[in-house]
Amino acid sequence: MPRSDYLFTSESVSEGHPDKVSDRISDTVVDAYLSAMPEARLGVETLTTTNRVVIAGEVRGPDSVTFKDLEELTREAVRDIGYEQSGFHWKNNDVAIHLHAQSADIAQGVDAAGNKDEGAGDQGIMFGYAADETPALMPAPIFYAHKILKDLADARKAKQGDAAKLGPDAKSQVTVRYANGRPVEVTQIVLSTQHLDESLDSADVRAIVEPYILKALPQGWVNEGTVWHVNPTGKFVIGGPDGDAGLTGRKIIVDTYGGAAPHGGGAFSGKDPTKVDRSAAYAARYLAKNVVAAGLARRATIQLSYAIGVAKPLSIYVDLHGTGTVDEAKLETVLMDALDLSPRGIRTALQLNKPIYARTSAYGHFGREPDADGGFSWEKTDLADKLKSAF
């Protein structure tokens, strides 16, 4: 029987965290190619370190996207994040690009030909999850860990008062107490943020960030018993890739459910939507969210599996964690009928062949508001009525 009274913790990192800088650049490259050719194929990895950005990977796309274009887009991305420090500056960084053609062996397994449908870009397992703990149907700890950092970043960029003294690199961690299976309060808050003014100490930084944190969290969740840890090392001036090297794809739990659900292991950023690591994880979230939105369960975990070159998923698994009102085995069949889970079917249904990925690279791929141009389409609940009517 699942526990109903417990503590659960999730962390988030800001767009200025070195790994997130790398994710942003990789997805900026993806967007550049998809803008020029919606069927472009990419697998792009980025290394960021002191005064240097290295982009490497495989591409099948138009020659109209030049390395000079990508260098300019990289500098724009770093500038938007906010890095203008001596060890990592958008204008002065060395940008090295090492992209080459996609392997023909991989392409032949993925490409549609004759009567063969487009196959998955790789084997793997992907998970989707939803819970009725927040308006976005996300687990509360990761949802609010993201919100804290996003609100602080928005204030920093808008130069709102003393928030302008903060730097781009930051991390948050939120511990939530559950009673009777529902989130009721925050017991621990951890916030480490870079600050540009070297004279600031932990108390000064807390005075800056506390109002934003309190506003981000539900009223009453923070009380006299909540323990705060703000810049516990005391000083955080050197941040971002100048402090630690960053790599694409190293924050996969931050990107998803904060540890509240299983993870198949595949990262998202730098991959075009033929890569099921990305597109099938989005589809699994879409299905799980619509199951919960339809009132069929309070919590839902969905697993999908694929083989390279094979169009249809090898399996689907549903776990409603004892909160469901319907039979899980029947729901598996209903979900397979409700959405074409082939790579092409997912891309078509969710309109994934668009330049919509740079915006996903920080503050979570899930629990976001769908955009008018198709971004975060997997967060829509337009399948809920169809699922409800199947029972």
From Swiss-Prot:
The lineage of its organism: Bacteria, Pseudomonadati, Pseudomonadota, Alphaproteobacteria, Hyphomicrobiales. It is found in: Cytoplasm. The gene is metK. K(+) binds at E45. The keyword Metal-binding applies. ATP binds at H17, D169, A170, K171, K235, F236, D244, R250, K251, A267, K271. It is an enzyme of class 2 (transferase). This is S-adenosylmethionine synthase. It comes from Methylorubrum extorquens (strain PA1) (Methylobacterium extorquens). Catalyzes the formation of S-adenosylmethionine (AdoMet) from methionine and ATP. The overall synthetic reaction is composed of two sequential steps, AdoMet formation and the subsequent tripolyphosphate hydrolysis which occurs prior to release of AdoMet from the enzyme.
